[in-house]
Regions:
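Conserved AdoMet/S-adenosylmethionine-binding subsite of the radical SAM
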Residues: 1-143
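Auxiliary Fe-S-binding modules of radical SAM enzymes
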Residues: 110-236
Length: 236
């Protein structure tokens, strides 16, 4: 058939794992040597992670933030399961790791990239890390991506100080943060971390009612006004 690999990526492929497993089984009946890739945000149970390790050939694992407030503000979920799973994957599935990845979101998580790198290095300094630029989308459609200079600065600092042996970075997306978002972030009291406040401001302006961004327990989770289909319509 001329296919040597198949990859499952975002949204988050692990929520469809039973169907993915079935698809992989059918593919391997025709192509026993086909490679199977996963690109994941890392938020899953250990049981699911173990199944992913058994099923796939390689994994790209993304850590969006190191600070819990920042991770909640960006994703609506705590960071602890992600860090736990990152460590488990490194210790128990090192041969499956294609790369760890983090995106640079200016003013939100860009001061945490080195923390993420040091966390990975503390487990295994040979794990590759890819640092890529945020591109405005979804709830952060109007938030700027990093400049080329900022990407270069972060990449060099991480490469020099984190202890990781394999760090790559590249890309940029220059814009500016709107005054309305900055003013909203200043008014928020439910989070103390400045990056978390900035990320939460976008959700609040889109209609999010949660002060802690715990989406799993939110009464509006099935009809959330911040679950934007057309984020460019936000008046920011």
């Amino acid at each position: 058939m001329g296919v040597d690999r198949m990859s499952f990526t975002g949204g988050e492929p692990t929520i469809h794992l039973p169907y993915i497993r079935e698809a992989v089984e059918h593919a391997r009946e025709q192509m026993p040597e086909v490679g199977v890739g996963f690109a994941t945000n890392g938020f899953m149970s250990l049981n699911i992670l173990q199944q992913v390790i058994q099923l796939c050939s390689y994994v790209t694992f993304e850590i969006k933030a190191f600070n819990d407030d920042t991770h909640r503000a960006i994703t609506g979920a705590p960071v602890e399961p992600v860090l736990r799973n990152a460590e488990y994957l490194i210790r128990n599935g090192r041969g499956r790791i294609r790369a760890f990845r983090t995106i640079v979101i200016p003013g939100i998580n860009d001061e945490e990239i080195e923390d993420i790198a040091e966390f990975i290095a503390s487990i295994d300094p040979t794990v590759p890390l890819r640092i890529i630029p945020f591109r405005p989308n979804y709830i952060l459609y109007y938030h700027p991506g990093p400049t080329s200079a900022r990407m270069e600065e972060i990449g060099k600092e991480v490469s020099k100080k984190s202890g990781l042996e394999n760090v790559w970075w590249g890309g940029y997306y220059p814009m500016e943060i709107s005054k309305r978002v900055i003013e909203t972030a200043r008014e928020l009291k439910s989070m103390n971390h400045k990056g978390a406040k900035l990320a939460l401001a976008y959700s609040r302006l889109a209609g999010c009612i949660s002060s802690s961004r715990n989406c799993g327990e939110c009464p509006s989770r099935t009809n959330c006004p911040a679950a934007l289909k057309e984020p460019w319509l936000l008046d920011l």
